[in-house]
Amino acid sequence: MSKDIHDSRILILDFGSQYTQLIARRVREIGVYCELWAWDVTEEQIREFNPQGIILSGGPESTTLENSPRAPEYVFNAGVPVLGICYGMQTMAAQLGGSVHSSDKKEFGYAQVEKVGNCALFDAIEDHITDGGNGVLDVWMSHGDKVMDIPQSFKTTAKTSTCPHAAMSNEEKRFYGVQFHPEVTHTHQGQRLLERFAIDICGCEKLWTAAKIIDNAIERIKETVGDDEVILGLSGGVDSSVVAMLIHRAIGEKLTCVFVDNGLLRLNEGQQVMDMFGNKFGLNIVKVEAEEQFLNDLAGKSDPEDKRKAIGHTFINVFDEQAKKLKNAKWLAQGTIYPDVIESAASATGKAHVIKSHHNVGGLPADMKMGLVEPLRELFKDEVRKIGLELGLPYDMLYRHPFPGPGLGVRVLGEIKKEYCDLLRRADAIFIEELHKAELYHKVSQAFTVFLPVKSVGVMGDARKYDWVVSLRCVETIDFMTARWSHLPYEFLGVVSNRIINEIDGISRVVYDISGKPPATIEWE
């Protein structure tokens, strides 16, 4: 009998670092399943999860403060290897009898750590060798506190000029602490260190692969729904597209996809979705023309949150109407992914602050008596894309820039009108087309056009024109938490601007948004 892909597993306890999800993604890239839980997990929950190793993440708190987060005592009594990263190392040291002090010299950014003695975690892993023969690692630091005294039975395994205990270990208990962040790419050997911990020290097997994830998902879908029919709201985005392919592979024609054309999509997007999933892949797909209904429900609304809620409410009503026509559908499929699950858990505990309401429609109508199928709820976005490729979806679709759930509803500023959407669709298509032509599209993280509800004077030939303004927006980011505006070539911007103004009657001016995040958000609304 083949092994379950979840049999080898690592537990990551989150102490609030901005890099914690990155740790989980790196561990999974190695081929090992892991889950991310809040630091205040109970002993019973850890026992039930039964991990082969535990990682303690970094965090913004200070272990020198009385009420700062601590790892559950059971973590150090569970008999499995433990890796503490940054704050995780500090709380390990403090809880096991060492001491942590605030440092006069804080370390943020690139640093070199020199290996000291022998350590299973670092063995034969280094970037440089000192004249004295010691290995050196290029790493990324981000800490204000430091371990002053390591616990008894621990030894120092790395140091810097300002941090005498940059890493420590208890080889007998297989406890390891590193003051730097192996999960970020700036730590050049970081992935090797995480692999050393997960595979060699914890004894995990590489069971978490795209092909095995697909097989497991299909098996679970079949077990869950049996011979029942399933309905899916297909948007053409990455998540719902991969869900559609997975469920179709599992149950074939018993899946009905509902594609709602709300009039807020990109140019020709509705036809592209129908061609790909209906004609090419042979899915059972129902297209609902709902532009008029959405625009009517949005009339008079200019506040972004009001627009979002109206779009979400109308979608639920339209979708519910279709679902009632499919009397045999007993299951609703959704494209929930792992970060959504983490975000929901954080919100439930009051640890998250809502900046914008979530784009995805949350919850079902009270009278929709259906079970829920969420085949992607264990997966990060990069994993969803990888299995999408394995399922045969085209690269350009899977790696297309993010498009918000409300679509052009949050890219037309103020009140939504069909005229504005039509102008914006064409302007945005020109911008994206030129990015592809210049081979810039996949070098930036997100690019789009925004319709501004203001008019500007222009001149065409000898005639004066007084028409609308659009703004181009293009950013580069790793995690979308922060972003810098893309420094696109002036010549390129000139080509885009000229094409938009010359080819689209109704637009007289094009501007370029040079706001970073923070202080601005990536989307305007």
Swiss-Prot record:
ATP binds at residues 235-241. The keyword ATP-binding applies. Coiled coil: none annotated. PROSITE patterns: GATASE_TYPE_1, GMPS_ATP_PPASE. One of its GO terms (cellular component) is cytosol. Its EC number is 6.3.5.2. The active site is at residues 86, 181, 183. Residues 9-207 form the Glutamine amidotransferase type-1 domain. GO terms for molecular function: ATP binding; GMP synthase activity. It holds the Pfam family NAD_synthase. It is an enzyme of class 6 (ligase). Residues 208-400 form the GMPS ATP-PPase domain. It catalyses: XMP + L-glutamine + ATP + H2O = GMP + L-glutamate + AMP + diphosphate + 2 H(+). Pathway: Purine metabolism; GMP biosynthesis; GMP from XMP (L-Gln route): step 1/1. InterPro entries: Class_I_gatase-like, GATASE, GMP_synth_C, GMP_synth_GATase, GMP_synthase, GMPS_ATP_PPase_dom, NAD/GMP_synthase, Rossmann-like_a/b/a_fold. HAMAP family: GMP_synthase. PANTHER family: GMP SYNTHASE [GLUTAMINE-HYDROLYZING], GMP SYNTHASE-RELATED. Homodimer. Catalyzes the synthesis of GMP from XMP. This is GMP synthase [glutamine-hydrolyzing]. It comes from Pseudoalteromonas translucida (strain TAC 125). The lineage of its organism: Bacteria, Pseudomonadati, Pseudomonadota, Gammaproteobacteria, Alteromonadales. The gene is guaA.
